[in-house]
Swiss-Prot record:
Domain TRAM: 383-446
Keyword entries, A-Z: 4Fe-4S, Cytoplasm, Iron, Iron-sulfur, Metal-binding, S-adenosyl-L-methionine, Transferase, tRNA processing
Entry protein name: tRNA-2-methylthio-N(6)-dimethylallyladenosine synthase
Catalytic activity: N(6)-dimethylallyladenosine(37) in tRNA + (sulfur carrier)-SH + AH2 + 2 S-adenosyl-L-methionine = 2-methylsulfanyl-N(6)-dimethylallyladenosine(37) in tRNA + (sulfur carrier)-H + 5'-deoxyadenosine + L-methionine + A + S-adenosyl-L-homocysteine + 2 H(+)
InterPro entries: Elp3/MiaA/NifB-like_rSAM (IPR006638), Methylthiotransferase (IPR005839), Methylthiotransferase_CS (IPR020612), Methylthiotransferase_N (IPR013848), Methylthiotransferase_N_sf (IPR038135), MiaB_methiolase (IPR006463), rSAM (IPR007197), rSAM_horseshoe (IPR023404)
Pfam families: Radical_SAM, TRAM, UPF0004
Organism ancestry: Bacteria, Pseudomonadati, Pseudomonadota, Alphaproteobacteria, Rickettsiales
Domain MTTase N-terminal: 3-124
GO MF annotations in UniProt: 4 iron, 4 sulfur cluster binding; metal ion binding; N6-isopentenyladenosine methylthiotransferase activity
Region forming the signal peptide: none
Gene source species: Rickettsia bellii (strain RML369-C)
Amino acid sequence: MSKKLYIKTYGCQMNVYDSVKMQDLLYPYGYEPTENIEEADVIILNTCHIREKAAEKTYSELGRIKKLQDARKKQGLNSAIIVVAGCVAQAEGEEIFTRTPYVDIVVGPQSYYNLPELISKVVRHEKHLIDLDFVEEAKFDQLPEQLYPQGASSFISVQEGCDKFCTFCVVPYTRGAEFSRNVEQVYREALKIVSSGAKEIMLLGQNVNAYHGKTSDDKVFTLADLIRHLVKIPNLERLRYTTSHPIDMTDDLISLHGLEPKLMPFLHLPVQSGSNKTLKAMNRKHDRDYYFDIIDRLRKARADIVLSSDFIVGFPGETDEDFADTLDLVRKVKYGQCYSFKYSPRPGTPGATRTDQVPEHIKSERLTILQKELAAQQLAFNESCIGSTMKVLFDRDGKFDDQIIGKTPYMQSVYIKNPNKDLLGKIIEVKITKAALNSLSGEIYR
């Protein structure tokens, strides 16, 4: 009889990728995935620590799991093994056992390949096991090949960690220094994914455009080199990458956007603020004019490229003038979509120790203003697509039985009617008929 594995994933696409790999790791040991937490023998929370709210979600979920465990005991059933993985695990370590002593295993994002051994120890009645080692090479060397197809659009982690040390960010402390996978390893995984039916691959990294992986003969590949290598794979039709840092946007990578048709005309390029003073305080290593120059060069390389970004409002010391500079940058760049957040002090980061924290109500006011502007830009872009035809990759079911959902080259969700679902996994020409803030509707173009 197989054992059941339940994984709940928080945060970024890298965590989604890691969760798939945890699933692949445990399958040979008899653990099959389930979406029903109540039948799980092992429960893994793959956590995010980028903001305080994200971290607290972990403890809230652990509280719910504790109630589930208590109910199982009353019924005479065995308790599930509880694992906290990911960036909260890396950041808080033993504190997790202090706050939630019923957790069995705490494992960081660079050491989860040891999960089979850790779980077997818990089965043998060992308790409070922790593994937070930063051994990136061992992690990638010991991860299994893909067992469960991810679908028409799949992720591959090619780079982890960050050396930039932005003063608001925990990534260097939770994911470690920048590390790039070797080229052959990435290529083999991409080949396997495409052979299982994927049409699109998203290359992942905390700072993916800093990629500097080696080949077997010690030649160093940049991200542009890696893309040129991967697009040769037969039946791979689309390639994307995220997340990028402006200072690592090389001339070669920028020009590749205009030369390689498989590289999609959409780029997530976080700037965080439009104020030079705030950018310096954040240790972003560039100013607003540098960012504008990157955007101009990208648009010269490919006129139809669409940008998205991340913004943080209320970083310590941010004034009304600084916030006005952010709004000015947003209005000048004109984004297709964006993510925006209130600054959240993270323990251990320089920003958290500053005495000029912005009051919460001011952060909220600024976020409301910024999100209104960003939403207007996103809606305007979506509405500009009405009447056009786009190639859409349909990769998932919709809410209704006769509906499927796909992605445009610009990462917009598109809904169409397809009762027999025969278009899933295919790229189809669609005429856009309606637009909303977060999605498009269309019909098959004939």
